[in-house]
Amino acid sequence: VMAGGIVAAFLGPGIATWTWDLFTSAPYAGSYVSLLILYIVSMMLIFFAKIPRPSPEEKSGPARPLSQVASQPEFLVAVVSALVAYGTMNLIMVATPLQMKGCGFDLVSSASVVKWHIVAMFLPSFVTGHLIRSFGVIRIMACGPVLMVFCVLINLNGITIVHFTCALVLLGVGWNFLFVGGTTLLTEAYRPAEKAKAQGLNDFLIFSTAAMTAVSSGFLHDRFGWTAINWAVLPAIGIALCAIVWLGRRRRVMLSSRVA
């Protein structure tokens, strides 16, 4: 799966640049047709996927109500972190090619920036798990919002190809630390029999946010501009960072009380 993200980082932008003018009467129609073909192929491959069956413990083990699971601090911080990770990433990533086009850059330049952004999203996954085991999930998660703040600062201070590339690389790594860390933290909030419900709610919230921010980013860029989008994500990033720091302190206090 992780290697697939790296392949997609090069294949996706490449397809966009190769096919955008496939139909001269409708620019970018070729890219959408190519995307449709890829979706059809993906759907066909899914039919052959072997999904593991739930274990006996997942089927009939002790389970709490979903409301009780979702009210735990670990669950709340994990979900908030993932929502901010996807929401911030989508708003800035989708708006970046639009801003670059407005600054006079061509499609090849925009595709290159998006390519390195996607590489930065998935390449760290090969070491993120090791970093979490070595430094703890809270520390790695806290790095995500910090990197995203640096991404915003770069975006607000220049519109060169270097600015766009560096900002989106930081955004990609920040997304990885925040999302992978949040996913890891989520596993601490549920029992095996609660897994399906807890992850189902988590995924519903995350991908609803991802869909809304992806759809609205273009409109927001057109209506309010590039600078406004970057300023707008800062409060959400701050909320995620505060939530992570709060949970880290809460855990230390609880650990100290147990030792005492």
Language-model regions: role of each:
Residues 1-14, 205-213:
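Glycine-rich segments within core transmembrane alpha-helices of 12-TM secondary carriers
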Residues 51-79:
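Juxtamembrane intracellular "pre-TM" segments in multi-pass secondary transporters
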Residues 17-37, 219-237:
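A membrane-interface helix-boundary motif in multi-pass transporters
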Residues 177-190:
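Intracellular juxtamembrane helix-capping segments at the cytosolic ends
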Residues 20, 124-137, 221:
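Helix-to-loop junctions at the C-terminal end of transmembrane segments
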Residues 189, 193-224:
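A late C-terminal transmembrane helix in Major Facilitator Superfamily
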Residues 139-154, 234:
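Structural signature of the two symmetry-related core transmembrane helices
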Residues 17, 36-56, 243-248:
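C-terminal membrane-cytosol helix-exit motif in multi-pass small-molecule transporters
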